[in-house]
Design a protein with these regions (language model features):
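Flexible, low-complexity segments enriched for small/polar residues
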Residues: 2-5, 10-24, 255, 259, ...
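Generic detection of long, well-ordered alpha-helical segments
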Residues: 2-3, 26, 30, 85, ...
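Short, compositionally biased low-complexity segments
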Residues: 7-15, 59, 67, 82-84, ...
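N-terminal accessory alpha/beta regions
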Residues: 22-128, 133-135
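Hydrophobic residues in alpha-helical segments
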Residues: 26-29, 40-41, 99, 134, ...
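Active-site substrate-binding loop specific to GH73 endo-beta-N-acetylglucosaminidase modules
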Residues: 72-74, 90, 126-335, 339-343
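Substrate-binding/catalytic groove segments of enzymes
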Residues: 122, 186-188, 452-454
Length: 487
């Protein structure tokens, strides 16, 4: 099968970004994939501005000022509610950035690393700062990224390294650094875990006083508590020394298995869930030899002829976030209620900043069950305010790690969607982009491999419509096809 420039470019945009923006469609038949890749790289250069969000800090002194336990309980509840709302707002702003930013490659990689270095923490500032690490360092050196993430307050808190001290080592952080972040299971021993945990003793974070002259006053930063560090000799992965945490990171990066593990995970995410071991080995060798240069690894993948092989196209079930952003990049949406978007993510099974566990989110068929598939296929109409949501979030499943969310976050009526989302579509640009196109041409922009039977059903459904109504219904129906779930 000979693929057109349009097909190749759409494939590249869905993998290296979040699909095409509406205004990009006319140029996709003219650009070569190499030109489009160069544009994606150029658009993601430079440091991104931080997505701002604030944590409300409740101190012991604040509570002691209050006269009764009831007043103190009320203040705690208020702060907890404000924290949840701010966390939802942060997630909503990132989703909006994914949708509208030209730096698609940067945001896509930040999303990938968000799943790789998964944390589930309620502190807004911890989430904000870790997200910024992903966005700033996600295309640079994996060595720098790994060290920055390992020293982040979010990771140290989530994996309990704040409690790791020489008198009583805590192995959580040391284990996950090897199992999930670098080597993968089976490439280290329990002795290595214990020795690494000793090396990471004393790694912690501390608060910067709000009245400090420091630029990060009121926030937290990495802090090495020397008194809690075990400075004795350690044996780790066959090497001996008085290792500190940085030494463990360095030794892990010396292992070619780390390059294999990361290259394999990136291949399965961006290319095909069925691994090609020879290609992964070749990629991992180049990744290792480059000093773990993430951008070079991605270029090796996204410019390779095999990336555009038919078996690697349209083979990936879109994650809920992918699906939301894909639709939003074609339909200019205004969503007035961040809470509604949060609830919708819960229904679909993927909530930004709330991965199910330290292993991150699953892939593939894990996204699809009988109820979620129905909602996914209704999603274009729900977002356009044309249809109500008839499935409520699951408050006690594995996505929530067995923890029910507060009732005010999930207590919704079955037909809530148009009111709660407060969503509107600016249809003018959509009509301008699609009105002169046949249904087959419209489908070529929205579906990887349009099926004749499906297009026939859409054609039949819109045959009596004309003008703007026909365009709107054609686009919504194409986005509601099972084929649109693949990218």
């Amino acid at each position: 099968m000979v693929l057109s420039k349009l097909q190749k470019n759409l494939h590249l945009l869905h993998r290296a970004g979040f699909g095409p923006a509406l205004e990009m469609l006319p140029q996709l038949s003219n650009q070569t994939p190499a030109q489009l890749w160069a544009q994606l790289v150029a658009d993601s250069k430079g440091l991104p501005p931080k997505i701002e969000a604030q944590q409300t800090i409740l101190t012991k002194a604040d509570l002691e000022k209050l006269p009764t336990e009831e007043a103190r309980r009320s203040l705690r509840q208020t702060v907890q509610r404000e924290t949840r709302q701010e966390l939802q707002r942060l997630a909503g702003m990132w989703l909006e950035t994914m949708t509208h930013s030209k730096a698609q490659l940067r945001e896509r990689m930040a999303f990938f690393w968000h799943g790789h270095f998964a944390t589930r923490i309620t502190r807004v500032d911890f989430n904000r700062d870790l997200l910024q690490i992903f966005r700033e360092k996600g295309l640079g050196s994996f060595s720098d990224l790994l060290l920055a993430v390992s020293k982040s307050s979010a990771m140290l808190a989530f994996l309990n390294n704040q409690q790791n001290r020489k008198q009583k080592p805590n192995e959580n952080f040391a284990r996950e650094v090897m199992e999930l972040f670098t080597l993968g299971r089976g490439h280290y021993t329990e002795k290595d875990v214990k020795e690494a945990a000793r090396a990471f003793t004393g790694w912690a974070y501390k608060a910067i006083p709000e009245n400090s002259d420091a630029p990060n006053a009121g926030e937290t930063e990495f802090y090495f508590r020397k008194a809690f560090h075990d400075d004795g000799e350690k044996t780790f992965l066959g090497q001996k020394g008085n290792f500190a945490g940085e030494d463990i990171i360095r030794i892990l990066l010396q292992q070619r298995q780390t390059a294999r593990f990361i290259s394999g995970k990136i291949y399965r995410y961006f290319v095909n869930e069925t691994p090609d071991e020879k290609r992964i080995e070749s990629l991992s060798q180049k990744f290792y030899d480059s000093g773990y240069n993430i951008s070079l690894l991605l270029e090796e993948i996204f410019t390779a002829p095999w990336f555009f092989e038919e078996k690697n196209m349209g083979n990936r079930i879109k994650s809920p976030v992918d699906l939301l952003v894909n639709i939003s990049r074609i339909l200019p949406l205004t969503i007035g209620n961040a809470k509604g978007l949060f609830v919708l993510q819960n229904v679909l099974g993927q909530t930004l900043l709330q991965p199910p566990n330290v292993a991150g989110w699953p892939m593939g068929t894990a996204w699809i069950d009988s109820s979620s598939l129905l909602v996914r296929m209704q999603l274009p109409y729900i977002l356009a305010g044309k249809e109500a949501l008839s499935v409520a979030p699951k408050p006690n499943d594995d996505i929530q790690m067995g923890k029910k969310l507060p009732a005010e976050d999930l207590d919704i009526k079955p037909a809530f969607a148009p009111k709660l989302l407060q969503s509107e579509v600016e249809w003018g640009p959509v009509e301008n982009a699609f009105e002169d196109l046949s249904l087959a041409q419209q489908a070529a922009y929205l579906l990887v491999f349009p099926q004749k039977a499906a297009l026939g059903a859409v054609q039949e459904a819109v045959k009596n419509l004309s003008g703007a109504d026909r365009v709107r219904q054609s686009v919504l129906r194409l986005m509601s096809l099972p084929e649109y779930q693949l990218g």
